[in-house]
Regions:
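Charged, E/D/K/R/S-rich low-complexity terminal regions of large eukaryotic assembly subunits
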Residues: 1-47, 61-73, 77-243
């Protein structure tokens, strides 16, 4: 069990920022501090993508250091930053012989629910109202997995709000409340102000946006530097093919 002190995330991150630079990034001696930082991320509702992915890559390179509880925490934390690609990246850094363990499979199934924006199913799982089936044979375990991750449900609500902002023009208040897990009127108003929604018909309907009038073209340009490619090549295991 990884031990940490409350409020330790900032100190750990500051130390790790120095320790995981350059060729020292995947030094096995960093494992303990990385695991402590991941535990602090969960309890203090903080997140650092570099630390999360570095920990997973270090486990790949040093299988004897592998800790499933830390991997589970990282996967759950990456779900709190959806619709970002961190969850997909994290899955790619877990070896095939480990990723199908019962607990990790539960997290992956939960991730599938959220990636498909199936908020109705998520809230049933979170509230213990989901009937067991082939996908979730022990649905009560999902709520137990989420409990140690501070702010998990709030992160899902923010994710849902972002999806609503990009897919709806208007939405009935009752439907909005369901998508957000049954929040009260005060919380609905809070999200409406944060995301710029306008209450209409005495609050029965929320105007989200006229997407037809706000369409903008966007070019996505990503550049890979030589140092990026070099680091990947250096840390990629070489496989010998025998024909």
């Amino acid at each position: 069990q990884v031990q940490y002190t409350m409020g330790q995330f900032d100190a750990l991150k500051s130390s790790l920022d120095d320790h995981i630079q350059g060729v020292n990034r995947y030094n096995p001696e960093n494992v303990t501090e990385l695991q402590q930082c991941v535990a602090a991320m969960a309890s203090e509702n903080r997140y650092d993508r570099d630390i999360a992915l570095t920990t997973l890559k270090l486990y790949q390179l040093n299988p004897d250091k592998y800790d499933e509880a830390t991997v589970r925490t990282i996967l759950l934390k990456t779900l709190t930053v959806l619709p970002g690609a961190d969850f997909a990246l994290a899955k790619c850094l877990i070896d095939a012989n480990r990723i199908n363990s019962p607990e990790l499979r539960l997290v992956l199934n939960l991730g599938s629910v959220l990636e498909s924006c199936d908020y109705a199913t998520f809230w049933k799982l979170a509230k213990g109202e989901y009937a067991a089936d082939d996908k979730f044979k022990a649905p009560a375990e999902i709520a137990k997995l989420m409990k140690p991750i501070a702010g998990f449900e709030e992160a899902v609500r923010v994710f849902a709000c972002r999806v609503i902002s990009t897919t709806f023009q208007c939405i009935e208040r009752a439907q909005l409340v369901r998508l957000l897990g049954g929040v009260n009127e005060a919380k609905v108003g809070e999200y409406a102000r944060k995301f710029g929604w306008e209450a209409r018909e005495k609050g029965a309907v929320y105007y989200i946006a006229n997407h037809d009038s706000t369409i903008k073209s966007r070019n996505i340009d990503e550049r890979l530097t030589f140092s990026n490619v070099h680091e990947v090549l250096v840390h990629t295991p070489v496989q010998t093919v025998i024909e």
